Amino acid sequence: MEGVGAVRFWLVVCGCLAFPPRAESVCPERCDCQHPQHLLCTNRGLRAVPKTSSLPSPQDVLTYSLGGNFITNITAFDFHRLGQLRRLDLQYNQIRSLHPKTFEKLSRLEELYLGNNLLQALVPGTLAPLRKLRILYANGNEIGRLSRGSFEGLESLVKLRLDGNVLGALPDAVFAPLGNLLYLHLESNRIRFLGKNAFSQLGKLRFLNLSANELQPSLRHAATFVPLRSLSTLILSANSLQHLGPRVFQHLPRLGLLSLSGNQLTHLAPEAFWGLEALRELRLEGNRLNQLPLTLLEPLHSLEALDLSGNELSALHPATFGHQGRLRELSLRDNALSALSGDIFAASPALYRLDLDGNGWTCDCRLRGLKRWMGNWHSQGRLLTVFVQCRHPPALRGKYLDYLDDQLLQNGSCVDPSPSPTAGSRQWPLPTSSEEGMTPPAGLSQELPLQPQPQPQQRGRLLPGVAWGGAAKELVGNRSALRLSRRGPGPHQGPSAAAPGSAPQSLDLHEKPGRGRHTRANLSQTEPTPTSEPASGTPSARDSWQRAAKQRLASEQQESAVQSVSGVGLPPLVSDPCDFNKFILCNLTVEAVSANSASVRWAVREHRSPRPQGGARFRLLFDRFGQQPKFQRFVYLPERSDSATLHELRGDTPYLVCVEGVLGGRVCPVAPRDHCAGLVTLPEAGGRGGVDYQLLTLVLLAVNALLVLLALAAWGSRWLRRKLRARRKGGAPVHVRHMYSTRRPLRSMGTGVSADFSGFQSHRPRTTVCALSEADLIEFPCDRFMDSTGGGTSGSLRREDHLLQRFAD
């Protein structure tokens, strides 16, 4: 057996030698090495680069993070054992210098972050070993000068950040070694001068940011940007530019975004943007422009967004945006504009976002064309809400143009800046019946139409159930019909406000086709006969005819205003779903409820819908009350629906039902809280009834009360038991208290000792027989018994003295 045990022992020893314990990796002090390829030493309070000699395999480290420490110097041996390193982060330290051989062994490094340190220069040759470097961050340092050797060897560099330094100039060919550079950040420096060849060899550059520098007041030399054939984004904002020379960007055929905001530009050459056919976004906000040359935007055929806010523009030529057919967003807010032509945006059919707020608008006849264009575009759903708030005249201060009545725009002696219609489409008003002797000038009777034709975009669809008379059908094209807005209804002018002297200067009936109310009947009455002699040969006759026409038009406008105030006219034209929910949709009621279905009905006020959008549809939203998230179920209903029945509902369950309008496939982003109704389905017949929550609540309350009573009873019984036990201990019989009284002599008490301990067994241990305690008086006879049996007289006397001292009064 001993031989077998020895054999087993040696086998165990050999097994332990064959499989030695794996050596644990030793991580540098204050660092984290949980991932074998990532050495994390960020925000550890380090003042020097930790030694990596303790790492078992430093060649496996691919990422080394040292950001957020207090490192001031990088030596030549800090990274010499990390030959496979791909990413090195040294940001937010206090590095002042780099040893020329710091990166000598990091030939595979792809990302180097040196931002937010105290570097004052990039010594030529320091970065040369980094042949595979693709990203270099040197932002937030104190670099004041660059040389061509600073980036020698960085042929693979794609992104370079030098922003937040103190660079004062860019020498020629400073970025020449960076042939593959795509992104260059030079913002927030002190660059005053751009060399003629500063960006040479950067033919692949796509992004260049030169904002927040101190560039010279005039940017005139186009040769600076000649090498940047692939540039798509150029940011020159927040400089001190005051003037742009002609064709300064002509060598940037792929430029898509140009930002010149926050400068001091007061003048732009008419050919400043020549050659920018691909430009999609132009930002000129925050300058001092007071006018735009007519041909300034002509080359920008692809322009989609233009920001001219925060300038000093007081007027714009009607043809300023005549070549911007793709323009979608335009901001003219916070300028000094008082009027705009109605045709200034006619060449931009894609325009849907227009900001005109913050100008000093004068609401008179010069804004009639703009109001008409806004109404047409908004009715077709092609334009978001435009806020044009009147500042002048004082009577209209604070009012919004889009809901002002045309009668309120007759003030002042002004001429509509919108171009007059062509001769073929011009329509003249006719004199009254009392002035039959006056005839229009020769040739005008043949141009007079029989009936005013409404514009195609104004012909709306009428909902069923709305009665429309013949006169209303002829007035479908009324441009001045009420249009609802989120700001509520606009002011109306009484009939007394329309006077013959306030008639408009223009005689074009297309401006207010609904005011004249010309029908075939009254046109036939006022049309001059062919036998009438024309009186238009002399200027006096022509002037008298025009005065009569103005009086006739004023009277018709007065009559139309009276009718509009009295409620006679067309229903409102609604294209916004939020306005539809607020003003048109009403009275959602629950008609019938069963165990598994419910019927709801709603009402729709009279209105018109634009032709491109079609009639209003409805969306019904319903869900069990209190469920999160709300409205998991909704149903789209067809046009002309005013009721719906919900099926497959759960019996005896509360539901919340809401309805909202759908116009042109769009719904209001605001929840339809104003058109909701609650219902509770009936219990299912013959089925098991649902839970009675009231009864369940009462039962639970009763059970809780019973539990509280039981707890109180248990506590009371325990307290009562304690009281009784204490009373029993304190109320012993008189003869017992008299027996153990300390006032009696000890001799009289010794007579009962033999009787009390007559059953004493001498073979039991002494400690078992008498468990002594100094706090118990019953120990006394037991002590005397033990002393009397083996102690003698002297022991008894000593104990008596002790007890006398202890129990003396």
Curated annotation (Swiss-Prot):
The modification Phosphoserine is found at S796. This is TLR4 interactor with leucine rich repeats. Residues 359-416 form the LRRCT domain. The chain crosses the membrane at residues 695-715. Component of the TLR4 signaling complex. Mediates the innate immune response to bacterial lipopolysaccharide (LPS) leading to cytokine secretion. GO terms for molecular function: lipopolysaccharide binding. Residues 26-57 form the LRRNT domain.
